[in-house]
Amino acid sequence: HTLSDANPLTNQWAAEEFFRSVSGALGDADNVIYEICNEPNGSTSWADIKAYAEAVIPIIRANDPDAVIVVGTPTWSQDLAAAAADPLPDANVMYALHFYAATHEDDLRHALSTAVAGGLPVFVTEFGICEASGAGEIDYASANLWVRLMNELDVSYICWNLSNKDETAALFKPGCAKTSGFTLDDLTDEGLW
């Protein structure tokens, strides 16, 4: 699934082939988390995503029965309420939330709190401390509120993005070409945070 597809059902056959291959190759590894349906958008509904997940998850489970599988949620992985209202029956599934601290504030934090309080297992598989575009200003106050909340709720999170792209969300400065031996001078403001 790519963002330009908007709906994961568009190329579901390709996702099935991909996850069959990847889970076949990595099924014995105990450190692999599968994220299916990255940032569904446009008019994609939870029913669309759920149908996709119900087709793809058994393919992964055939090769990796105990793996954690994270499923994207509608509206760029932000509509946890839709997933909470009709969750998948699989016991080892989590639901993705993506946010950018300078864009997504109290409303989305409340949605996360509500979903977790209701028992929905959530993994923040992408966040940044800048605007949702990956550019713009950093909002340290909102970012700190987000991290405090995720820690209080025991929600795992991953910061986007580990690159040297010329944008606010990148953790490394554009001129950094290293693959190891990083110093603080190699980091952007988001990387230093």
Enumerate the predicted regions with their spans.
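Aromatic-lined carbohydrate-binding surfaces of glycoside hydrolases
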Residues: 1-8
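Extracellular glycoside hydrolase catalytic/binding regions
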Residues: 11-33, 37-165, 169-193
